[in-house]
């Protein structure tokens, strides 16, 4: 799964807020784009063209992480697998200029922390994050930072192996 915003500078969400006389503390002011690169039941061969979308120029814009994590979590909760792991690949902090220009500067960060805390403390789903070039441990209890995107594959395997090994030791 992937996520971004549909527009720079807010799009329809911002226009609607403007036309409603700009009420105070409006919350998110950008249109979301949630992307299913590969569904849980889709074979890798069927998804390979979709995976190439990650590299499409102009697709990725701003990041409203909390709502994206919530969306991914709700999809994962519906799955029938016994064990569920939500691995987040992050390039840093949630940022959306349209939203942050009219809400508190930590609005998106607070929301992300709230969502992650709920998953970590009250959910059967395990969540971990890999920050590319950024330390994301202020958002996620299980987090690792890498400096080079070329490390990503090996670190993903290593982190998953550690999770499986730690779970095995409990039984």
Feature map (PLM): residue ranges:
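Acidic, glycine-rich A-domain
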Residues: 1-171
